[in-house]
């Protein structure tokens, strides 16, 4: 079963109003998809993270020539060569190969992996809380309320991009509006030191209904995380940009995190992503994969999560939630998968089990104009 054709789909969506996190505001969202087709006409889609012009050049210049003629079932021999060059490229190719193999076997993704343990997965609405507007706090709270009205009861909002006092005002106002009807996670995008992160205990202690405190510190600061975890009043989450399964080990061995957040697009392949999830289970941490970038990597995260044993016997079926981007982003509607009541049913059809919106794929195709990464 050889790869005959490789197509690229660089997609670009200009935002009506920039939004962002502690790293700054975004004016656009982008997505790079690939479609591999075998000689027998079996199709597999992949998603790659990165700057569109660079990804397109890499694929046209050497990835497509490298992939043409490769045997899908000999992935173990040649995918590591791609992983050595670029984890981002290899992640996308790995997804496409997985879909092709599942489709050939006549199985859904989860059945290819040995079967589903959870038929639906909870999702939390994820926000980019900042904007250039003076009334950004009110706008942020309105967005959370729109997700609440759509059935979400778990939300993640950003901190660390404004002063502590301003962020505190935002979060307290949000909790008051939610009236304890929803749980909130705070994501600082690695913007604090230990002392500043611990100032949040003041807010955590006088309100409840929290989920976790995400990446308060640079993720390399294992000692800082261990110290913070001993004193913080919320579970500490992190690891969305870690590049290998092994890079979770220092944090896990030191007991530095309560929750790990592997991201398939950073981990160079479907198998290393799934290994990271199981590694977390072996260490007894919770696992809530990071899935901000695109709908296909989110679908893989949902399916992989559905195959995990339960984290706890105490909370329903004990499976942790997955991130669901609830910001303005037309790329989110590219596949036919939407949450209902804060849950997403796992697709049962052959392969990835969802349909692509071909018209939207065409409409969102990047026109090649230059833009700042
Ligand atoms: Mg994060």
Feature roles, as predicted:
Residues 36-105:
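Metal- or metallocofactor-binding catalytic centers and their adjacent structured scaffolds
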Residues 65, 202, 208-209, 220-237, ...:
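Shared catalytic-loop signature of beta/alpha-barrel
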Residues 1-45, 49, 325-332:
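Structured beta-strand/loop patches that form or line metal/cofactor-binding pockets in enzymes
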Residues 112-232:
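Metal-dependent enolase-superfamily TIM-barrel catalytic cores that perform enediolate-based chemistry
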Residues 3, 34, 41, 93, ...:
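Conserved, mostly hydrophobic/aromatic
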Residues 327-373:
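C-terminal extensions of enzymes
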Residues 46, 123-126, 153-157, 184-188, ...:
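Hydrophobic faces of well-ordered beta-strands that scaffold small-molecule active sites
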């Amino acid at each position: 079963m050889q790869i005959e054709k490789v197509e690229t789909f660089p997609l670009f969506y200009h935002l009506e109003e920039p939004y962002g996190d502690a790293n700054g505001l975004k004016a656009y969202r982008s997505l790079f998809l690939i479609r591999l087709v075998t000689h027998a006409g079996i199709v597999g889609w992949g998603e790659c993270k990165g700057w569109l012009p660079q990804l397109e050049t890499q694929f046209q210049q050497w990835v497509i020539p490298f992939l043409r003629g490769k045997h899908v079932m000999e992935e173990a021999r040649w995918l590591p060569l791609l992983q050595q060059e670029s984890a981002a490229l290899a992640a996308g190719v790995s997804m496409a190969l997985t879909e092709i193999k599942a489709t050939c076997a006549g199985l859904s993704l989860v059945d290819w992996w040995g079967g589903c343990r959870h038929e639906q997965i909870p999702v939390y609405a994820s926000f980019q809380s900042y904007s250039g507007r003076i009334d950004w706090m009110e706008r942020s709270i309105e967005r959370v309320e729109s997700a609440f009205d759509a059935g979400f009861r778990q939300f993640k909002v950003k901190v660390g991009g404004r002063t502590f006092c301003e962020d505190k005002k935002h979060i307290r106002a949000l909790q008051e509006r939610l009236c304890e009807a929803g749980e909130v996670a705070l994501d600082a995008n690695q913007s604090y030191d230990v002392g500043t992160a611990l100032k949040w205990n003041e807010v955590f202690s006088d309100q409840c209904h929290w989920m976790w405190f995400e990446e308060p510190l640079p993720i390399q600061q294992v000692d800082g995380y261990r110290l913070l975890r001993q004193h913080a009043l919320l579970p500490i989450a992190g690891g969305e940009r870690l590049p290998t399964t092994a890079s979770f080990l220092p944090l896990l061995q030191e007991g530095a995190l309560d929750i790990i957040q592997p991201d398939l697009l950073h981990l160079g392949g479907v198998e290393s992503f799934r290994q990271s999830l199981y590694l977390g289970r072996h260490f007894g941490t919770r696992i809530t994969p990071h899935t901000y970038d695109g709908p296909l990597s989110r679908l893989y995260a949902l399916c992989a999560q559905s195959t995990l044993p339960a984290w706890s016997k105490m909370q329903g079926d004990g499976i942790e939630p997955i991130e669901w981007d609830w910001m303005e982003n037309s790329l989110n509607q590219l596949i036919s998968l939407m949450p209902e009541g804060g849950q997403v049913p796992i697709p049962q059809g052959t392969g990835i089990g969802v349909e692509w919106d071909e018209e939207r794929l065409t409409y969102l195709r990047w026109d090649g104009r230059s833009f700042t990464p």
